[in-house]
């Protein structure tokens, strides 16, 4: 690993390394997707290599699967694992109730399936990801390509009656073409600025024809590990007044 990192990378690495401490021998793990989750995969691989830690990893994207295999982490499918002990993943935003926005890496469908098939979900994030109210980060919604314009119109219509600010819905692109998820679906990003009732919004979106899944993770995350630019880490459990500070130096 590089000797010097930016404060943001230091925070991500610190959170990832602390979260990997929760992994025990013999566990079946959900491996998240994104820049912070990539640090976690590297830290996990280090424990596998140096400690002989025995784990099975279920990746939440083709990118994570490729990285895990390259680093020597045994990879299995969720169908093979059936149920997981722990999932560790990043988040684009989280609030005080550990509601999350995920999907900035376009892997929200597999991420949610894996997280809900786990006994526990730990989110790793830098301190900037904590918000008083969700909505500053665009909310991803995965939709099937067929009729996506109609699906977008239905989403825009549904937003009118909900407690949100901002109703712009855009198609995520990769260059000139629509971005494709691992399932060959599209992503619509909802630019809402504020989400008053995340649960209501999540339920409403998933009732719209053409919507596959949305990036709101409600009642799924149990623990958040927050990294700071100076290497400190805060571990927070939902419902417990517990803050653990640790200096994770190089």
From Swiss-Prot:
Its EC number is 5.3.1.6. SUPFAM superfamilies: D-ribose-5-phosphate isomerase (RpiA), lid domain, NagB/RpiA/CoA transferase-like. Pathway: Carbohydrate degradation; pentose phosphate pathway; D-ribose 5-phosphate from D-ribulose 5-phosphate (non-oxidative stage): step 1/1. Keywords: Isomerase. The active site is at 111 (proton acceptor). One of its GO terms (cellular component) is cytosol. InterPro entries: NagB/RpiA_transferase-like, Ribose5P_isomerase_typA_subgr, Ribose5P_isomerase_type_A. The keyword Membrane does not apply. The keyword Isomerase applies. One of its GO terms (biological process) is D-ribose metabolic process. Substrate binds at residues 33-36, 89-92, 102-105, 129. It catalyses: aldehydo-D-ribose 5-phosphate = D-ribulose 5-phosphate. GO terms for molecular function: ribose-5-phosphate isomerase activity. It holds the Pfam family Rib_5-P_isom_A. It is an enzyme of class 5 (isomerase). Signal peptide: none annotated. Homodimer. Catalyzes the reversible conversion of ribose-5-phosphate to ribulose 5-phosphate. Belongs to the ribose 5-phosphate isomerase family. This is Ribose-5-phosphate isomerase A.
